[in-house]
């Protein structure tokens, strides 16, 4: 990604129609880069997998909702594990179209919408709500967590993964990793050429504590916070020095991914 600038702290990031419209347009442009990527059983680049962490447990006969369902491959994974109902929400019409094809032979319910929006999904209905590398796109984290809380049955689980909030500040040059910018300043970061395309996007920038505190405010009980180790699937793999944003070289020194599991009381 080609970083343009990080804006100054703007306080609580509220729902922005302009940001959502721009991100939606750009995601429709770059969706083909993500077909089958950032999907279960994976949690993120080089991160431990569901097979290693076992956060979902048994999902047979459970109703599941995928926030930021992308190409539908995480829902496909849930179907293969016996989930009874598959629901998904994604901002991108192109992603939803791909997900329809991925899930063509199983019953599913897909909606093209921002995750921040109230779109009439059933309340106190789902056993599990999850989001794999998507939750950080929300322009209103508090509203999104409150909606997710409302979708879950009492005792239901909410599991999400996202870039470790400090990882974006770790740059690599000639094998040396250094801190770039201020982790303290929340706000938004703009990228002009997402995935090398003419696809400008705006991504909120938040601290790890912000995610945790907003979960608490939404009445979730936090069960687990994971700063993921490198998956055992990369055991023995060589780590060539790389200046790429995601690299095994960096991942073995700092977690690319945070994973949080919380419960509705």
Give a label for each model feature.
Residues 142-157:
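A short glycine-rich, Lys/Arg-flanked "PGG" loop and its adjoining helix->strand segment in the class I
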Residues 162, 166-168, 196-210:
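Acceptor-substrate binding/catalytic loop of class I
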Residues 201-225:
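Short alpha-helix
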Residues 65-118:
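Class I SAM-dependent methyltransferase SAM/SAH-binding core
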Residues 133-136:
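Short catalytic micro-motifs in class I SAM-dependent methyltransferases
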Residues 4-60, 73-77, 158-190, 236:
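Conserved class I S-adenosyl-L-methionine
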Residues 120-129:
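A short acidic, Gly/Pro-enriched loop at the edge of an enzyme's catalytic core
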């Amino acid at each position: 990604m080609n970083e343009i600038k990080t804006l100054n702290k703007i306080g609580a990031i509220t729902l922005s129609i302009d940001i959502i419209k721009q991100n939606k347009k750009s995601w429709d442009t770059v969706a083909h880069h993500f077909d089958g990527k950032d999907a279960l059983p994976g949690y993120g680049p080089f991160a431990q997998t569901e097979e290693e962490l076992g956060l979902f447990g048994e999902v047979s006969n459970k109703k599941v909702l995928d926030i930021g369902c992308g190409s539908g491959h995480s829902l496909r994974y849930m179907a293969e594990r016996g989930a009874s109902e598959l629901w998904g929400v994604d901002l991108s019409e192109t992603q939803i179209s791909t997900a329809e094809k991925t899930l063509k032979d199983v019953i599913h319910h897909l909606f093209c919408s921002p995750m921040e929006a109230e779109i009439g999904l059933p309340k106190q209905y789902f056993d599990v709500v999850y989001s794999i590398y998507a939750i950080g796109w929300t322009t209103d984290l508090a509203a999104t967590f409150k909606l997710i809380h409302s979708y879950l049955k009492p005792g239901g689980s909410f599991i999400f993964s996202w870039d470790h909030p400090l990882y974006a500040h770790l740059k690599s040059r000639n094998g040396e990793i250094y801190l770039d910018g201020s982790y303290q300043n929340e706000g938004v970061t703009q990228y002009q050429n997402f995935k090398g395309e003419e696809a400008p996007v705006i991504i909120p920038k938040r601290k790890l504590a912000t995610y945790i505190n907003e979960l608490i405010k939404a009445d979730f009980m936090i069960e687990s916070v994971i700063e993921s180790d490198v998956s055992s699937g990369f055991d023995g793999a060589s780590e060539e020095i790389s200046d790429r944003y995601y690299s095994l070289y960096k991942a073995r020194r700092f977690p690319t991914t945070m994973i949080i599991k919380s419960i509705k009381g």
